[in-house]
A protein has these predicted regions:
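Short alpha-helix
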Residues: 173-195
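Conserved class I S-adenosyl-L-methionine
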Residues: 9-51, 65-69, 87, 142-172, 199, ...
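A short glycine-rich, Lys/Arg-flanked "PGG" loop and its adjoining helix->strand segment in the class I
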Residues: 127-142
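A short SAM/SAH-binding and catalytic strip from SAM-dependent methyltransferases
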Residues: 113-126
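A short acidic, Gly/Pro-enriched loop at the edge of an enzyme's catalytic core
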Residues: 102-114
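Conserved Class I S-adenosyl-L-methionine
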Residues: 192-232
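Class I SAM-dependent methyltransferase SAM/SAH-binding core
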Residues: 57-59, 63-103
Length: 232
């Protein structure tokens, strides 16, 4: 039996997440700007769908690092959606939409691919998120997403940043096990093609100040999950 968070808690979570990103936006560049993001982006690009001539959604686009990649991939149209306007205003080259990833403001079956980087844990309901993604995908359309691994969060890792005032802030993040995500995809009519797990000190091994101690402490812990799925 699964316990589901109450609606009031989920609304509070979404509000807290939005406030965190509004604080983060002024210091959040539209690039993979840390070792984790660089490892994640390399792995995402290795399973990148062919979007040439297609219509693609960059879901929860942030400041637009994947929108930039998509625009260089010769997609016919790139649509970037995010709920944080200060983040969205940094996106270049894409059609920008400010909205919720839980209720996508698009007609059904209009995208050839949906890309989402490190954002699934901000979904207040994973089944609804997968259902909305599947709805806007065309038949045989591709979903490619990454997120922070549930094992990393359970091991004690947090998602945090330093704002303009050099104050460390934590970003709220839901924990969705892979099995939970698999169930949600199956219910939405999405078939998994690829699953990747990036582990501390193995796939994620770029040196940075203090990295030796970090990798020793967390060695082998999965820190990023990457999934590619196809709409049936």
């Amino acid at each position: 039996m699964r316990a589901y968070p109450c609606r009031r808690f989920l609304m509070s979570l979404a509000s807290s997440t939005l406030k965190a990103y509004e604080r983060w936006a002024p210091v959040y560049p539209p690039t993979a700007h840390n070792p984790l993001m660089r490892a994640e982006q390399r792995s995402m690009l290795e399973v990148w769908p062919n979007v040439e001539g297609g219509r693609v959604l960059d879901l929860a686009c942030g400041s637009g690092r994947y929108s930039h990649v998509l625009c260089k991939s010769n997609a016919a149209q790139v649509v970037a959606l995010d709920f944080c306007l200060p983040m969205l205003t940094q996106v270049a080259g894409a059609s920008r939409v400010c909205g919720s990833m839980m209720q996508l403001p698009f007609q059904s079956g209009v995208f050839d691919a949906v890309i989402s980087g490190l954002a699934v844990g901000h979904a207040t309901d994973i089944r609804q998120w997968m259902s909305e993604v599947a709805r806007v995908l065309r038949p045989a359309g591709i979903l490619l997403y990454s997120d922070f691994h549930s094992e990393a969060i359970r091991a004690g890792m947090t998602r945090s940043f330093k704002d303009e005032d050099d104050v460390t802030r934590t970003v709220p993040h839901q924990v969705y096990d892979l099995s939970c995500q698999q169930d949600a995809m199956a219910a939405a009519g999405l078939t998994i093609e690829t699953v990747r797990e990036l582990r501390m000190g193995i796939e994620l091994n770029e040196a940075f100040p203090g990295s030796e101690g970090v990798y020793r402490k967390w060695y082998g812990v999965p820190v990023v999950l990457i999934v590619r799925a196809r709409k049936e």
